[in-house]
């Protein structure tokens, strides 16, 4: 019995020694691979050779992290540029240029009614235009001299009408009515003429259109 136990112990001891040798051999192979990668990296980057720690503890710590990506110079970290705010940016929720002209005159709390209105272009046509064709006039709005705004104001006293005319805007107020009109073309504000037609209960405002074309005979 004692001889059998001794033989069993010898077998177990032999197996442990064999496994220990295999583990040492694997560790040696792994360490050799790590040393080879570090040596190759040192050849490619001689100026960084002093920065490497070849001690066994340091080597064993970096074994798992070594790979083909460690060969060559270290990758520089990409720095993301933070865009600086433009000097023209402000805390406004919209650009002042995007606000339509006349919006500052509008009041959402004003409950006055908006009257009906229409915009009409008019032009003066003479015999030289109809029969002789001596000018370059045509029926388009570009050839019209006047812009007429007709506003329905029933039961309104003309003395109660307040009107303000800008180059691209008409602002009309009465005790019961309110109207803001944006013109399709700029007008000469000093040329405005207003008249109230009692039969039609309509206010007509005539203004001269600012024209780029000149239809006078040269």
Curated annotation (Swiss-Prot):
After gene disruption, what is the outcome?
A: Deficient mice develop normally but manifest male sterility. Sperm are immotile and fragile with the axoneme of the flagellum lacking outer dynein arms (ODAs) and inner dynein arms (IDAs) and showing a disturbed microtubules organization.
What biological function has been recorded for the protein in this entry?
Plays a role in cytoplasmic pre-assembly of axonemal dynein.
Name of the protein described by the UniProt record: Dynein axonemal assembly factor 6
To which protein family does this belong? Belongs to the PIH1 family.
Extract the InterPro entries matched here: DNAAF6 (IPR026697), PIH1D1/2/3_CS-like (IPR041442)
Tissue-wise expression? Specifically expressed in testis. Detected in pachytene spermatocytes from 5 weeks of age and in pachytene and diplotene spermatocytes of adult mice. Not detected in spermatids or mature sperm.
- Entry's Gene Ontology molecular function annotations: dynein intermediate chain binding; protein-folding chaperone binding
Query: Which keywords annotate this record?
Result: Cytoplasm, Golgi apparatus
Q: Whose protein is this, by species?
A: Mus musculus
Q: Where in the cell is it found?
A: Cytoplasm; Golgi apparatus, trans-Golgi network
Q: In which residue ranges is the amino acid composition biased (Basic and acidic residues)?
A: 75-89
One Pfam family assigned to this protein is PIH1_CS
Q: What is its main location?
A: cytoplasm
Please verify whether the record's keywords include Magnesium: no
GO BP annotations of the record are: axonemal dynein complex assembly; cilium movement; flagellated sperm motility; inner dynein arm assembly; outer dynein arm assembly
Q: Where is this region: Disordered?
A: 66-103
This protein's assembly is summarised as: Interacts with HSPA1A/B, HSP90AA1 and DNAI2. Interacts with DNAAF2 and DNAAF4.
Cellular component aspect of the GO annotation? cytoplasm; trans-Golgi network
């Amino acid at each position: 019995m004692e001889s059998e136990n001794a033989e069993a112990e010898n077998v177990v001891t032999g197996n442990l020694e064999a496994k220990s040798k295999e583990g040492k051999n694997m560790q040696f192979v792994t360490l050799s691979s790590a040393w080879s990668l570090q040596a190759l990296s040192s050849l490619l980057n001689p100026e960084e050779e002093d920065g490497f720690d070849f001690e066994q503890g340091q080597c064993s710590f970096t074994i798992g992290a070594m790979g083909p990506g460690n060969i060559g110079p270290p990758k520089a970290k990409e720095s993301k540029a933070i865009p600086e705010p433009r000097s023209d940016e402000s805390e406004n929720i919209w650009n002042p240029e995007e606000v339509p002209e006349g919006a500052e005159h509008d009041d959402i709390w004003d409950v006055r009614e908006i009257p009906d209105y229409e915009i009409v272009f008019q032009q003066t046509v003479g015999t030289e235009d109809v029969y002789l064709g001596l000018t370059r006039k045509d029926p388009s709005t570009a050839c019209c001299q006047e812009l007429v705004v007709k506003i329905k104001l029933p039961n309104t006293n003309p003395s109660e009408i307040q009107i303000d005319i800008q180059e691209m805007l008409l602002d009309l107020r009465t005790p019961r009515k309110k109207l803001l009109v944006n013109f399709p073309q700029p007008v000469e504000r000093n040329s405005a003429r207003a008249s109230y037609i009692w039969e039609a209960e309509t206010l007509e405002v005539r203004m001269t259109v600012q024209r780029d074309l000149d239809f006078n005979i040269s």
